[in-house]
């Protein structure tokens, strides 16, 4: 019987992918392998690598050893079988969808997703022959009714953007699997420290690693994690890209070649090969530095956020706080169930008044930076209706509960008293 013990999250985030020192140099820190290409031992070795018969480095567009450590570590933290790092979160989402969606296919997506992903689905993919249905993820009957014969995926986020709505992943997974389609979950705002969607039935998890994983607003990156549980071959006609012969690999079937890791293997071998949204070794290394302190930072983010929510709830100039920790929030009970340690450091509130009052508050808010990123160690603020979600129509904004009075906060890890004082001061400018 094995005596090997299962390591816990805080240990995994430091050691996976480099359990021993670097074999070439004995360096304890993960090296930056700043190279474009790799030497093959002989011609047969090169042919086996290109033919997917031997796993390993081929060319820098596809793999890199620094990148590999990062991929393995995120996959382990999420409880997946394999990971793929790419140049940005947007690339991760795009590749995950393109991997199974073809001309004539259909996707069902939640209505509270990130504005960029919403545009990808409703505008960009739709020009490529992919139809869509946008649904309220709380309305399970609506979700199920939206699934068609040509539906290839159900897509949602752990926490909605920007209002921090909570997704019932277990229920969506049940619906998706009843119709033999995968559930793809963006866990950027949840982080694997607070929730692991694969354990709740998700099949594929995507991240903008730019956010909590990196944590410092310094590097772009995205990650796709393969849960390894969806049976692509049992649904071969629905998922030919994974379960039928691949023309550019002489008829190889990814579900056979890569087994449980078929999903990310095909993205790497086909989509990344052909379109090249490659993460740089340096960015992968920077994101690894962030990953090593993920649990510590997220704990502080959550502590501060809950105190800010409490403060805003009592502020007479605030009309509503959109956070599931608030007892009156429709997702409050689900939030307590899925996030016993809290969560949701990115959320919105509606100021009394409208755009004028929201802008007045934002423009006088110290410490908080006015920018489009979130999940930085530094606190951030923005007006979603005129920035991150400005591509949406007035009707779409209202459907997502984003109003002229809505302000989005991303709470950092500063001293909470300093943050409360800054908020209090900014409210004095709102008449």
What does each of the following model-derived ranges do?
Residues 2, 122-123, 131, 149, ...:
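PLP-dependent enzyme catalytic core of the Aspartate aminotransferase-like
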Residues 2-5, 17-21, 84-315:
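Conserved PLP-enzyme active-site core in the AAT-like
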Residues 2-64, 72-73:
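N-terminal "arm"/small-domain region of PLP-dependent enzymes with the aminotransferase-like
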Residues 42-91, 116-124:
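Conserved N-terminal alpha-helix of the aminotransferase class I/II PLP-enzyme fold
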Residues 154, 222-224, 321, 347, ...:
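Well-ordered beta-strand positions enriched in small/hydrophobic/aromatic, beta-favoring residues
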Residues 159, 188-190, 326, 352, ...:
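Active-site beta-loop-alpha junctions enriched in small/polar residues
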Residues 225, 348-350, 410-412:
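Short hydrophobic/aromatic beta-strand micro-patches
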Residues 275-278, 282-284, 289, 293, ...:
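Conserved small-domain helix->loop->beta segment predominantly found in fold-type I
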């Amino acid at each position: 019987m094995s005596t090997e013990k299962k390591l816990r999250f805080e240990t995994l985030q430091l050691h996976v992918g480099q359990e021993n020192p670097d074999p070439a140099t004995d360096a304890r820190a993960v090296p930056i392998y700043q190279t474009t290409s790799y030497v093959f031992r002989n011609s047969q070795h090169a042919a086996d690598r290109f033919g997917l018969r031997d796993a390993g480095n081929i060319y820098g567009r596809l793999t890199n050893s620094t990148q590999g450590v990062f991929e393995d570590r995120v996959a382990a933290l999420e409880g997946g079988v394999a990971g793929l790092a790419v140049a940005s979160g947007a690339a991760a989402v795009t590749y995950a969808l393109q991997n199974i969606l073809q001309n004539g296919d259909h996707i069902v997506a939640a209505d509270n997703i990130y504005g960029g992903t919403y545009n990808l689905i409703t505008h960009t993919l739709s020009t490529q022959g992919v139809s869509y249905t946008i649904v309220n993820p709380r309305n399970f009957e609506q979700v199920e009714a939206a699934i068609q014969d040509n539906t290839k995926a159900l897509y949602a986020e752990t926490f909605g953007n920007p209002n921090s709505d909570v997704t019932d992943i277990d229920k969506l997974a049940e619906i998706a699997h009843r119709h033999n389609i995968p559930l793809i979950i963006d866990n950027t705002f949840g982080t694997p420290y607070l929730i692991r969607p694969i354990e709740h039935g998700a099949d594929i998890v995507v991240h903008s690693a730019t956010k909590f994983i990196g944590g410092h607003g310094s590097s772009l990156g995205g990650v796709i994690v393969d849960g390894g549980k969806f049976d692509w071959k049992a649904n071969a006609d629905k998922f030919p890209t994974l379960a039928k012969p691949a023309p550019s690999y002489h008829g190889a079937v990814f579900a056979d070649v890569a087994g449980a890791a078929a999903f990310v293997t095909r993205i790497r071998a086909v989509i990344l090969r052909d379109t090249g949204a490659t993460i740089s070794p340096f960015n992968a290394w920077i994101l690894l530095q962030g990953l090593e302190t993920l649990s510590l930072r997220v704990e502080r983010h959550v502590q501060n956020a809950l105190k800010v929510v409490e403060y805003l709830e009592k502020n007479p100039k605030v009309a509503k706080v959109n956070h599931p920790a608030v007892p009156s929030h429709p997702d409050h009970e689900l939030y307590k169930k899925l996030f016993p340690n809290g969560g949701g450091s990115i959320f919105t509130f509606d100021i009394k008044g409208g755009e004028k009052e929201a802008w007045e508050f934002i423009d006088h808010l110290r410490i908080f930076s006015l920018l489009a990123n979130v999940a930085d160690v530094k606190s951030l603020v923005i007006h979603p209706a005129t920035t991150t979600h400005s591509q949406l129509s007035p009707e779409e904004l209202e459907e997502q509960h984003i109003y002229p009075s809505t302000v989005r906060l991303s709470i950092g890890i500063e001293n909470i008293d300093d943050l409360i004082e800054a908020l209090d001061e900014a409210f004095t400018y709102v008449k």
